[in-house]
Amino acid sequence: MPMRSASHRVLVVTCCVFLLGSVCSPREVPMKTEQNAQSQEQATRAAIDRFNEAFNRHDADGLAPFLTEDTVFEDTSPAPDGRRIEGKAAVVEFWRGWFVRNADARFEAEEVIVGGNRATVLWVYHKMRNGQPWHLRGVDVFTVRDGKVAAKLAYVKG
């Protein structure tokens, strides 16, 4: 192997470090990851907002486009664990009946916290009970997949 000068070896090493650094810059990886996370969170938030808008219109058929085929809804009742409803058709039918039974009901999202494909919604449920305004507080934990609600797990206070 021919002997190279020290300055030649330094130049080769410097070029390799520069080239590897420009191809594999650690500064770019977090930026791309951050952009992906922001994109995912924006998609999650948009899915939750669309779902809540259709919900407050009491539009069961309007919810359907925002649900995955294998969506899961865990209701707050009956106590102690609630019931689990699986599949888009079953969840839409559940909400159709619920909207009829609770025609004056309205959910107010107090806060929506998004992390990746998950969202937590702190809400107040308003309706009339015995002619008087009534409310209940709760939390929904959503999982979003491909821009649609894959799971909505509901929890209430009291």
What is each model feature region?
Residues 107-112, 124-125, 137-142:
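Hydrophobic/aromatic beta-strand elements that line small-molecule binding cavities or substrate pockets
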Residues 29, 135-158:
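Short beta-strand edge/turn micro-motifs at domain boundaries
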Residues 2-13:
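Bacterial N-terminal signal peptides that target proteins for export
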Residues 51, 62-63, 71, 87, ...:
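Hydrophobic pocket/interface hotspot
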